[in-house]
Swiss-Prot record:
Protein name, per record: 4-amino-4-deoxychorismate mutase
Enzyme Commission number: 5.4.99.67
SUPFAM superfamilies from the UniProt entry: Chorismate mutase II (SSF48600)
Annotated organism of origin: Streptomyces pristinaespiralis
Keywords linked to the UniProt accession: Antibiotic biosynthesis, Isomerase
Function of the molecule: Involved in pristinamycin I biosynthesis. Probably catalyzes the conversion of 4-amino-4-deoxychorismate to 4-amino-4-deoxyprephenate.
Short name of one Pfam family: CM_2
Alphabetized PANTHER family for the sequence: CHORISMATE MUTASE
Superkingdom as given in the UniProt entry: Bacteria
Highest classification ranks of the organism: Bacteria, Bacillati, Actinomycetota, Actinomycetes, Kitasatosporales
InterPro entries xref list: Chorismate_II_sf (IPR036263), Chorismate_mutase-related (IPR051331), CM_dom_sf (IPR036979), CM_II_prokaryot (IPR002701), Isochorismate_pyruvate-lyase (IPR008241)
Length: 129
């Protein structure tokens, strides 16, 4: 993956001038991190809805074919965008482990909220019915 060109630093007029481009890049990184965290939270909330569907319809929590599909999608994305596929596999393994844990707890609780932040936020917003 090749990073985009970075604008040339302004003429040095002191320590602050040298950090302005870095500060701007860090601000963009912070915004990207906020979007990433919101996307993860949204994904976890959706997985709780899936857990509720599975609970109501007696669908097994573990769906190996779905996990394989998610990994295949990530591998395709990695290939298309020059990202290390092993990195995305590790990232998705972590995400999938957490979503399976949440779904399993949701199903085992009979749909009652369990004491984790994502459950509390989902219940408070009415995200899980």
């Amino acid at each position: 993956m090749t990073p985009p060109a970075i604008p040339a630093a302004p003429p040095a007029t002191g320590p602050a001038a040298a950090t302005d481009p870095l500060d701007a890049l860090r601000a963009r990184l912070d915004a990207a991190d906020a979007a990433l965290l919101d996307a993860v939270r949204t994904r976890l909330d959706i997985c709780l809805r899936i857990g509720e569907y599975k609970r109501l319809h007696q669908v097994p929590m573990m769906q190996p074919h779905r996990i394989a599909q998610v990994h295949a999608n990530a591998a395709r994305y990695a290939a298309d965008h020059g990202i290390d596929p092993a990195f995305l596999r590790t990232l998705y393994d972590t995400i999938i482990t957490e979503t399976c844990r949440l779904e399993d707890e949701w199903i085992a609780s009979g749909g009652a909220p369990v004491p984790t932040p994502v459950h509390a936020s989902a219940s408070a917003r009415g995200a899980v019915s």
